[in-house]
Swiss-Prot record:
<protein>
    <recommendedName>
        <fullName>Small ribosomal subunit protein bS21</fullName>
    </recommendedName>
</protein>
<dbReference type="GO" id="GO:0005840">
    <property type="term" value="C:ribosome"/>
</dbReference>
<dbReference type="GO" id="GO:0003735">
    <property type="term" value="F:structural constituent of ribosome"/>
</dbReference>
<dbReference type="InterPro" id="IPR018278">
    <property type="entry name" value="Ribosomal_bS21_CS"/>
</dbReference>
<dbReference type="InterPro" id="IPR038380">
    <property type="entry name" value="Ribosomal_bS21_sf"/>
</dbReference>
<dbReference type="GO" id="GO:1990904">
    <property type="term" value="C:ribonucleoprotein complex"/>
</dbReference>
<comment type="similarity">
    <text>Belongs to the bacterial ribosomal protein bS21 family.</text>
</comment>
<dbReference type="GO" id="GO:0006412">
    <property type="term" value="P:translation"/>
</dbReference>
<keyword id="KW-0687">Ribonucleoprotein</keyword>
<dbReference type="InterPro" id="IPR001911">
    <property type="entry name" value="Ribosomal_bS21"/>
</dbReference>
<keyword id="KW-0689">Ribosomal protein</keyword>
<dbReference type="Pfam" id="PF01165">
    <property type="entry name" value="Ribosomal_S21"/>
</dbReference>
Length: 67
């Protein structure tokens, strides 16, 4: 779990907030929260995963044809 600790001598809220946001983004908390916001049936998850794989494959094929 990301956390930022402040010293009493070096109290700069803006810098601490920036560091915290960076840690949260690096940990992937926001994307995980958006993904879990609504229940998704396993069949829907499989369909999305399969569609993403197909999209990656088509992109790879297009890239190979361009080169």
């Amino acid at each position: 779990m990301p956390g930022v600790y402040l010293n009493e001598d070096d109290y700069n809220f803006d810098i601490a907030l920036r560091r915290f946001k960076k840690q949260v983004e690096k940990a992937g908390i926001l994307s995980e929260m958006k993904k879990r916001q609504h229940y998704e049936k396993p069949s829907v998850m499989r369909k999305k995963k399969k569609a993403a794989a197909r999209k990656r494959l088509l992109k790879k094929i297009r890239k190979m044809n361009m080169a």
